Regions:
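Helix-loop-strand module that forms the ligand-binding subsite of alpha/beta enzymes
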Residues: 33-112
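Glycine-rich phosphate/pyrophosphate-binding loop and the adjoining helix
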Residues: 23, 37, 109-145
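Residues at alpha-helix caps and immediate loop-helix transition turns in enzyme cores, especially N-
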Residues: 12, 61, 95, 125-128
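Short histidine/acidic/glycine/proline-rich micro-motifs that form metal-
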Residues: 3-7, 55, 86-91, 116-122
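Short helix-capping segments at alpha-helix termini
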Residues: 19-26, 74-76
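Alpha-helical elements of Rossmann-like donor-binding domains used by nucleotide-donor carbohydrate transfer enzymes
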Residues: 15, 64, 98, 128-131, ...
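A short beta-strand-loop structural module common to alpha/beta enzyme folds
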Residues: 23-35
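N-terminal beta1-alpha1 ligand-phosphate binding loop
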Residues: 1-23
């Protein structure tokens, strides 16, 4: 799930989706943060969170998702793998840190290092997002996570 008001985060979300869909043993869904519910999080085998960096933090919409779903998911998603991608105007560290902190509270398990695209999406960063999606899906398909 992701949020964006521009094209950069959408580009990375689509790349991650393409990577995940390359793993035939899994079913992948792409949802916007505002359209995601606690039931979606509970039903997922893994979760990939994507956001722009806004003022050194995650987007308000992604924070809203956590606010709306935290207590419904608390102690029900323990150990579920997650990963993060961030489109950053700065270094993305604030967004990553705070997403990780909330995910720690949910007892989610960090499966991969974050992908942070700084300033503009380079072909390498788009490929990194594709690989992130593929890695998360393959980890689920083959019981690694």
């Amino acid at each position: 799930m992701y949020h964006t008001q521009g094209s950069r985060t959408t580009e990375l979300a689509q790349a991650a989706l393409d990577g995940a869909r390359g793993v035939e043993e899994t079913e992948t869904t792409l949802k916007r943060a505002f359209d995601t519910t606690a039931d979606d999080l509970l039903a997922a085998d893994a979760i990939l969170f994507g956001t722009p960096e806004n003022f050194g933090y995650m987007s308000g919409a992604l924070k809203d998702l956590f606010d709306r779903t935290f207590y419904a998911c608390e102690n029900k998603v323990n150990g579920k793998p997650y990963a993060v991608f961030v489109c950053a105007g700065n270094d993305g560290s604030g967004a990553v840190f705070n997403i990780d902190r909330i995910c720690t509270g949910l007892k989610l398990k960090k499966a991969c290092e974050p992908v942070v695209a700084r300033k503009v999406n380079t072909p390498e960063q788009v490929e990194a997002a594709r690989e992130l999606g593929a890695t998360l899906a393959a980890g689920i398909a083959f019981g690694i996570f």
